[in-house]
């Protein structure tokens, strides 16, 4: 261990995140500005559960305890004192010091050369990054703490309430978890899922989506939403239609030029609550990342739509609890309100990493959603 207050974790399970997938297959742009905040060489894998193998912890954890990793390497783990304004408020995913302190640049485990990831038998973790797994929560449930919290954080960006109509674009890991949370944690929310593949559509229905629409053809997506919410549709002959009414909120877990263009066409024009000044409609929350291209954005200004970025998770306030998103998740599990583990469709030993990544990539062929690595306890 290079620095004080660091531990060694022995990996039990690690999940393939969409960001891992994009990096392995070079699915992105070389000029992505995030490259200024990462360093090489890298060992990927930031969705990790395992055992505390070595190291002392101020949180009274002991060797052999089950741990879920909080992968963000911000001020505390970088030995920066005083911490930045974001870390002081519990929003360490917005840390101002990802390229400073005692560690090489990196925003989270797996993209710093000092903080290697969970696609390995062992990995380092600052004690602040180690969260104990409650006894009644399974390894698989705990492994989904990170993607669940990403979805939960995105929903809390808008004031979802009874009667809200929400669309979720994309039914991969984040999209399906967003659907599950909206239907199982919130009351009386209508959810429209837009999926690419039939096995994703089936899981969206299993998780409670009120309407599931195939993402192609795109004009049909708009038409089906107009039918569902019973609103007027506007179009010129042979041109892509759009709506002034539509859904209140869209959670875009793909964030491609096409999904953003469809999004600004299906989201209802802006409406504000006169008492709280919160936006009751006209908001797109973006959690996905795709390469930029041109798209037609006229409805964006016309309907005064707000497009909000949502980055990972933080200390969240919900149902009179203010705590890290992982602990909200644990509470929902313990109360029996939901179980997201059906999204885990494939499990591989690390030695079969090529097969695992190809399975994650060929979603239609293998009917894959969440692909994970499993390590022996011995």
Task: Locate each region found by the language model.
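C-terminal substrate-binding/catalytic core of Rossmann-like NAD(P)-dependent dehydrogenases/reductases
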Residues: 226-240, 244, 291-345, 354-355
